[in-house]
């Protein structure tokens, strides 16, 4: 920061947090913010995009079912589990980094099971991603989710997050789950590309999300705990807030 002429965060919140972290140091450059973006031409499904432009709910619903069929073929081929395109489908898919809290929704497992087994309001959940080879904490997290959900027919873990798989997950999901520790996600662009494909963000208001979010209109925001609380307590509170929303 002392050697540079300028620096920027990759979302407005990231810029704000970075200034709080570094502005007490003498001789550093100005820290601004330039929010990351994604290429709509690459990520959006053309037929779905046309339906969204026309505000044609029937066409949107029909195309989403077609895209879910494609995603669920991938899921079936890898896991053997058969998902229903008529059921609300939640996807958590990204790097298995600890701060992203892939297992937050499972924290109160008994309450999670009640939601997962609710026949009146059924859901399906897909986790996808890869931990780094020697990140044993992330590997344990991945394994924990697998073992906790392996006997649930409507929950599964898919290995990988290559571009083609990422595209299927965003196009075939109904809800895109994003629950990092607050102030830890610099930007996080997966929710942008999910939104391009009529997948609603269910998210902590971190990274780029506060610049986009209108709770109950274009997304659902998970209420965050007080900043002053210990992280373990924050995790418990935010897990309950997530389950409340579901």
Give residue ranges: language-model regions.
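Catalytic cores of carbohydrate-active enzymes across secretory and cytosolic contexts
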Residues: 1-246
């Amino acid at each position: 920061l002392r050697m540079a002429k300028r620096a920027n965060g990759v979302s407005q919140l990231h810029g704000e947090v970075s200034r709080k972290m570094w502005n007490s140091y003498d001789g550093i450059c100005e820290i601004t913010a330039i929010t990351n973006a994604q290429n709509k031409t690459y990520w959006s499904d053309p037929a779905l995009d046309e339906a969204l432009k026309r505000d044609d709910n029937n066409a949107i619903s029909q195309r989403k079912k077609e895209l879910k069929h494609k995603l669920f073929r991938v899921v079936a081929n890898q896991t053997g589990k058969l998902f229903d395109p008529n059921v609300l489908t939640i996807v958590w898919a990204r790097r298995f980094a600890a701060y992203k809290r892939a297992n937050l929704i499972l924290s109160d497992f008994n309450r999670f099971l009640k939601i997962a087994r609710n026949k009146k309001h059924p859901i399906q959940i897909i986790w996808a991603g890869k931990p780094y080879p020697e990140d044993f904490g992330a590997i344990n997290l991945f394994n924990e989710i697998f073992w906790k959900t392996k006997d649930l027919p409507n929950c599964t873990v898919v290995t990988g997050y290559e571009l083609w798989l990422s595209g299927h997950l965003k196009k075939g999901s109904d809800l895109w789950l994003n629950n990092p520790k607050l102030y830890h996600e610099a930007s996080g662009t997966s929710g942008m590309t999910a939104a391009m494909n009529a997948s609603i963000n269910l998210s902590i208001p971190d990274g780029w999300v506060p610049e986009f979010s209108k709770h109950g209109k274009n997304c659902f925001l998970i209420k965050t705990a007080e900043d002053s609380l210990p992280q373990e307590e924050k995790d418990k509170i935010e897990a309950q807030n997530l389950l409340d929303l579901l």
